[in-house]
Amino acid sequence: MALLSFERKYRVRGGTLIGGDLFDFWVGPFYVGFFGVTTLLFTVLGTALIVWGAALGPSWTFWQISINPPDVSYGLAMAPMAKGGLWQIITFSAIGAFVSWALREVEICRKLGIGYHIPFAFGFAILAYVSLVVIRPVMMGAWGYGFPYGFMTHLDWVSNTGYQYANFHYNPAHMLGITLFFTTCLALALHGSLILSAANPGKGEVVKGPEHENTYFQDTIGYSVGTLGIHRVGLILALSAVVWSIICMILSGPIYTGSWPDWWLWWQKLPFWNHG
């Protein structure tokens, strides 16, 4: 595959974390590196085990395939392969692949001499996954509290986990997480539409620049965060949504086991209006 005009000067030796020059090469447009190799190995292992688990199941129908965690009776012990052991090894493989990919991103950043914002942000996604399949189950004492790897069974797990606490929408951390996810979508939509509107003027008009973009929001809401600032805002909003989603799940089960609607009874007992 032909290189773009600017690519060759960035394909330089160095910046690797492990392996030195051994895996310091590209395959087509893709940088390999030591962690590219480990990503591939973990991915192949995990995928092969998923296929094995599907073969043990009742059907090859996509919607019915499910790799289930061990029964809670196994606690945190290693389960037999057909009774949850596959899920445990697949989970380990997934974490290995995700972390390897993040470290590969670090190596690419080092080669380009740029900041580590991308692997840092991706690390929050990894943490969200680990919180569901490792941290929360460990805090609750059994791998069986992790979610199954299957289309319908995963949806069932989400529904059942919510109903275990009466109504998950009353979880305050869930409220904040969902609000931040929607706010992130709004910020990205506003930013994207502004850039497209400035870059696609009417016929005969010149392409507009940051001055027009800033002025639009100053005229609309009285303030513009700026071209660099909107990306900081977007990153902060997105990572905050992930953080509160993690807190939401860690609270439910390991810390609080009651009904989330009942949790709000403290509000009714505040002395400002509680005269009973």
Swiss-Prot record:
Pfam families: Photo_RC. One of its GO terms (molecular function) is metal ion binding. One of its GO terms (biological process) is photosynthetic electron transport in photosystem II. InterPro entries: Photo_II_D1/D2_sf, Photo_RC_L, Photo_RC_L/M, Photo_RC_L/M_CS. (7R,8Z)-bacteriochlorophyll b binds at H154, H174. Fe cation binds at H191, H231. It is found in: Cellular chromatophore membrane. Belongs to the reaction center PufL/M/PsbA/D family. This is Reaction center protein L chain. The gene is pufL.
